[in-house]
A protein has these predicted regions:
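NAD(P)H-binding glycine-rich loop region in Rossmannoid oxidoreductase-like domains
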Residues: 1-26
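Structural signature of the Rossmann-like NAD(P)-dependent dehydrogenase/reductase core
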Residues: 7, 48-53, 102-108, 132, ...
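Conserved Rossmann-fold NAD(P)-dependent oxidoreductase catalytic core, especially the SDR/UDP-sugar
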Residues: 7, 11, 32-79
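Short alpha-helix in the Rossmann-fold core of NAD(P)-dependent oxidoreductases
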Residues: 24-31, 35-38, 50, 85-86, ...
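Conserved beta-loop-beta element that borders a ligand/cofactor-binding pocket
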Residues: 53, 89-113
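Substrate-positioning beta->alpha
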Residues: 84, 125-152
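Mid/C-terminal beta-alpha module of Rossmann-like enzyme folds, strongest
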Residues: 142-208
């Protein structure tokens, strides 16, 4: 047996947009397999499970509902197979019978190779939309601290069996226009208005907040 299961993997966009059926199989299938494995352990009631969900589950979040709350209804954007798979996977954990679970709905992950991700998804953001990014380092720290703080007894029973939105904090809340400026500036390029036609960017049906 084990004490903790941290399920942080999954098939995400843009690969999820190109291969929707594989995305469903991967994300939902993984959740089902993990739940079965946990429940099959002799100490199943003692195992604590953390599942990383996504704010994409609450769909399009343009102004004035651009900042999300944990209690917001699930409303997946049109054609967002990734978010659909995450909703079903999340439900799989919640309804599995696992005694202690927690769902962390993560925002966009900021990682060093994001500049190499040359895909049409770069235009699938409202230029005046906002996002609170979460760095890959903070994601790792969260998982580490979850285990360490629980072992110290700092996470009470009221922490488990709940949903939480997670991000890297106030300093990582930025408009998509500002984010484009930072990315392009890193490459020594002019601002987005100099390189892109505003009509290339969508106006709605984005899944960030």
């Amino acid at each position: 047996g084990c004490d903790y299961v941290l399920h942080v993997g999954g098939m995400v966009s843009p690969a999820a947009d190109w291969k929707p059926y594989r995305t469903q199989k991967t994300n939902i299938g993984a959740a089902e397999n993990i739940c079965k494995a946990v429940l099959a352990q002799p100490n199943a009631d003692d195992i604590k499970v953390c599942y990383i969900g996504t704010v994409a589950e609450t769909g399009d979040r343009n102004y004035p509902i651009h900042w999300g709350r944990c209690g917001d209804p699930l409303k997946v954007s049109i054609y967002d197979h990734y978010a659909v798979s995450k909703c079903v996977a999340e439900r799989t954990f919640v309804e599995s019978g696992i005694k202690n679970w927690v769902v962390m709905r993560q925002s966009g992950i900021l990682y060093p190779n994001i500049l190499k991700n040359m895909d049409p998804i770069m235009f699938h953001v409202p230029i005046n939309g906002v996002l609170e990014w979460c760095t890959v380092e903070d994601s790792g720290r969260l998982m580490c601290n979850l285990v360490l703080e629980d072992e110290k007894g700092n996470l009470g029973s009221d922490f488990w069996n709940h949903f939480y939105n997670i991000g890297s904090g106030k300093e990582y809340r930025i408009s998509n226009y500002e984010f484009e400026q930072l990315l392009l500036g890193t490459l020594g390029l002019a601002g987005p208005e100099k390189l892109f036609d505003a009509n290339w960017f969508i106006l709605k049906n984005f899944h960030g907040q």
